[in-house]
């Protein structure tokens, strides 16, 4: 099972090694604007799942939102500690 920290480490590794065919690399290459649009899309899906779907569906939507937030963080060069300072 992945944690927030292990997912972030995996995304940083993908950004550094740029494996061919990686969806994460494609998302990073698409830039902050595209990443931000995905964050908004996934946030809306989380909201809808919270109101109308099962806990399992909600958890899956939250995981997708966390993925895109982390892709955006990596794209901007932020570290987890940059965010943790504000929690």
UniProtKB/Swiss-Prot annotation:
- Hey, which pathway is this one from? Amino-acid biosynthesis; L-histidine biosynthesis; L-histidine from 5-phospho-alpha-D-ribose 1-diphosphate: step 2/9
Keywords for the protein's UniProt record, in alphabetical order: Amino-acid biosynthesis, ATP-binding, Cytoplasm, Histidine biosynthesis, Hydrolase, Nucleotide-binding
**What enzyme class is recorded for this protein?**
hydrolase
Q: Where is the signal peptide?
A: none
User: Which catalysed reactions does the entry list for this protein?
Assistant: 1-(5-phospho-beta-D-ribosyl)-ATP + H2O = 1-(5-phospho-beta-D-ribosyl)-5'-AMP + diphosphate + H(+)
Q: Name one Pfam family in it.
A: PRA-PH
- Enzyme Commission number(s) of this protein: 3.6.1.31
Principal subcellular localisation of the protein: cytoplasm
Q: Give the UniProt entry's GO cellular component terms.
A: cytoplasm
Q: Where in the cell is it found?
A: Cytoplasm
**Gene Ontology BP term (one):** L-histidine biosynthetic process
GO terms for molecular function, please?
ATP binding; phosphoribosyl-ATP diphosphatase activity
Q: Which protein family is it in?
A: Belongs to the PRA-PH family.
* Record-linked NCBIfam families: histidine_hisI, PRK00400.1-1
The molecule here is called Phosphoribosyl-ATP pyrophosphatase
Task: From the UniProt record, report the name of the gene that encodes this protein.
Answer: hisE
């Amino acid at each position: 099972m992945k944690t927030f920290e292990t997912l972030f480490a995996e995304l940083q590794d993908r950004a550094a090694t740029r494996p061919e065919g990686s969806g994460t690399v494609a998302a990073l290459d698409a830039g902050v604007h595209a990443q931000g649009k995905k964050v908004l899309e996934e946030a809306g899906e989380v909201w809808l799942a919270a109101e109308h779907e099962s806990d399992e569906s909600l958890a899956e939507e939250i995981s997708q939102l966390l993925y895109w937030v982390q892709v955006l963080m990596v794209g901007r060069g932020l570290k987890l500690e940059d965010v943790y300072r504000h929690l």
